A protein has these predicted regions:
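Extended recognition/assembly regions associated with phosphoester-bond processing machinery
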Residues: 1-222
Length: 222
C-alpha cells in the first residue's frame, strides 16, 4: 500500500505510514519518534563536525505534510525529539514559531527520551510515558511490556529489490509491540538483526520498510 500498512495491536487498528509515522485513525493519534531536532548543532558544538544546516527544516517539512494530510487530534513525540537539551534551545525563532503552528489546535505530548530526558521549553505535555486505551507509548521498549508503542532504536532492514540490496528505515511489529523508525534527518539506524532487537521482538515479527511506499517482510533476524 502506498500510504501505509495496516495492522492490529491489542484491538487498535494502526497504520505504519510510508513516511515513518504511526497513525491510529480511530483516536486520531499521530505518533512520531526520534526527530532529533538540532542534531547538526550538537555535532558542531561537541565535536566540531559541520553538517548541512537544513536538518530541522527538512524534518519539520515532512512532519507538517503528515499533519496537514491527516489532521490529528493528538500528536505524540516518542522521545529524542531534540538531540539534547541544549539543541532544544538552539532552534531559531522561525523554527520555534513553526513548531508552535504545528501544535496549534491539538493535544501535543512530548515523551522523554534518553537524549532529552527532561522538560523542554515548548508547549505541550511532558511525560515519561502515555497511555490511551489499550496502548502505552514510551521511548524505550520494555521486554516484559505488551500493547507497547516505542522508538529509540532507529530500526532499519534490508530487502532484495530487482537484484540489488536496499536498506530502509522500518517499523518492527509483532503481537505485543511496535517499534517506530527514526523520523529525523541524519538519524542513522540499527539493523533489525542486531542482538538487542532480536531479543525484544518475537520470531514471528514483521518489518515495514518505509520510503515512497511501504514494503512488508518478515523481520530479518540474521
Amino acid at each position: 500500500m502506498a500510504d501505509g500498512h495496516i495492522f492490529s495491536l491489542f484491538g487498535a487498528q494502526l497504520t505504519a505510514r510510508a513516511s515513518g509515522l504511526l497513525w491510529w485513525a480511530h483516536r486520531r493519534i499521530l505518533c512520531v519518534s526520534d526527530l532529533h531536532l538540532g542534531k547538526a548543532d550538537r555535532l558542531a558544538r561537541r565535536s566540531g563536525v559541520m553538517s548541512p544546516p537544513y536538518e530541522i527544516t527538512d524534518t519539520l517539512l515532512r512532519l507538517e505534510a503528515e499533519i496537514d494530510a491527516l489532521g490529528p487530534a493528538i500528536v505524540i513525540c516518542l522521545g529524542d525529539s531534540f538531540d539534547d537539551l541544549a539543541a532544544a534551545k538552539s532552534l531559531d525563532n522561525v523554527e520555534v514559531q513553526w513548531l508552535y503552528r504545528l501544535q496549534s489546535g491539538r493535544q501535543w505530548i512530548w515523551i522523554e527520551g534518553n537524549h532529552d530526558p527532561g522538560p523542554v521549553e515548548f508547549a505541550g505535555q511532558h511525560l515519561a510515558e502515555f497511555r490511551d486505551g489499550p496502548l502505552v507509548f514510551r521511548h524505550i521498549s520494555q521486554k516484559s511490556a505488551e500493547a507497547e508503542v516505542s522508538g529509540h532504536y532507529h530500526p532499519k532492514a534490508r530487502v532484495q529489490v530487482r537484484n540489488r540490496s536496499v536498506t530502509r528505515p522500518c517499523f518492527l511489529y509483532d503481537d505485543k509491540r511496535v517499534i517506530l523508525p527514526a523520523f529525523g534527518t541524519f538519524t542513522g539506524g540499527m539493523r533489525s538483526d542486531a542482538p538487542v532487537l532480536k531479543d525484544i521482538m518475537q520470531r514471528q515479527a514483521f518489518a515495514v520498510l518505509t520510503g515512497e511506499a511501504c514494503h512488508v517482510i518478515p523481520m530479518p533476524q540474521e
